[in-house]
């Protein structure tokens, strides 16, 4: 791409090898890009700051008063066709990973508790929508008698009319708070999905959908057992509490 840009702009064709050396000498390195949080305008930044410094302490205090689960929720789809990442290989030999080519994913709803690291999850083959989200939350409510404070993002079906009706019907035990827009970094369960992808999905071959499903369910069960691996995912909030103290 850089070679083509130079050719188009300056009419000079450099070899790829020379360009690599030139870029290294200029202080560049070949890196994998990462996603950055969007919405960095002043208004969005102020809403994020207010949520972290004002709203979050109130949510935490409410959960402590009620002895409630403080659950951060999110959903994810793990693709059968697999995913790629960096890995070590001999120079000149690009590694390859088999793929089924099947454009199908195993979906998972998840909630993790701030205080205990408890992990609630439900895998499904259906679509992620209001109906399946309500079924998951109903299952969670049935599994405990404790009050629940739910922190969720702004996915459209999280705030649909069906969900609003569901939340109202369970208001005695279930309190819902919305994360600010453009704030995946405020949702610790995103890190859990990343860990599962890194350990169990990247560079793996899933010839059948059941192979994927079994692999994902084993990973989910592992985190459900090992709460000590879930609790560190909340380090961002614990550090922010220390700064605000």
Whereabouts are the PLM-identified features?
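RNase H-like two-metal-ion nuclease catalytic core shared by retroviral integrases
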Residues: 39, 153-154, 161, 177-199, ...
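Conserved short alpha-helical interface segments
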Residues: 1-41, 69, 76-78
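RNase H-like DDE/DDD metal-dependent nuclease/strand-transfer catalytic core used by mobile genetic elements
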Residues: 81, 130-178
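Mobile genetic element proteins and their domesticated derivatives, centered on retroelements
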Residues: 2, 19, 74, 110-111, ...
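Short, solvent-exposed loop/turn segments at secondary-structure junctions
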Residues: 26-29, 75-79, 114-117, 155-158, ...
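Extended, low-complexity cationic-aromatic segments
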Residues: 10, 48-138, 237-244
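RNase H-like polynucleotidyl transferase catalytic core
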Residues: 94-101, 168-188, 205
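C-terminal anion-handling pockets and recognition modules
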Residues: 66-70, 190-245
